């Protein structure tokens, strides 16, 4: 774990859990991944921790809790930003992020200390990327996989089919643990992926069953039926994923 330093942003909430995780990779040639929200104290902490060794900024996706700090840090340190733009519209888009380097699936970012492989994982967002630290078999997952919570897949940019496909895609990589965008490091990656896929498919089957059994068409009522195992105060969030299941 010497190559990885985690800094958690002070933005706890229903969507973000304990806060957004920012990662510094390397010892001398540092890569900053997901600088997080544009919060001054968080940006200051990142710059202090980087000790003038940050050479590039990578973003897993451009939601407002992951990328807004990229531009101010890039300007201060005079380093390039790497990532992708969304394919269309997004409900939570950070409009300040425009990558200097556009990343594509299977791209490699090589330094003398480590190699990062880019894995395009659309689903949570069309431009979502994961980054595999080859020397550690550690996957920086962003919001593709989170600790302690399932991922919200919401319209218009989210796509449940793409999300399942992107989860299955990870089986071909050698991964020993996850460094998620929210929460703690996660071991047993294969079992974690299998569990998420089972959960999503089970939820989809439940949607079909509830639609057939109830005949209900009201979105709020259907969400309550499908997510009756989830605390009611989270139904407003669950509704985003339900919209995609309902219309798929």
Where are these regions (language model features)?
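Hydrophobic/aromatic beta-strand patches that form the interior of the parallel beta-sheet core
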Residues: 5-7, 58, 82, 101-103, ...
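Short helix-to-turn junction characteristic of helix-turn-helix DNA-binding domains
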Residues: 211-215
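Metallo-beta-lactamase
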Residues: 30-32, 37-38, 115-122, 126-206, ...
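Conserved beta-strand hairpin/beta-sheet module of binuclear metal-dependent hydrolase folds
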Residues: 1-51, 130-142, 147
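Short acidic, hydrophobic short linear motifs in intrinsically disordered regions
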Residues: 216-233
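Active-site HxH/HxHxD metal-binding segment of metal-dependent hydrolases
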Residues: 13, 18, 37-115
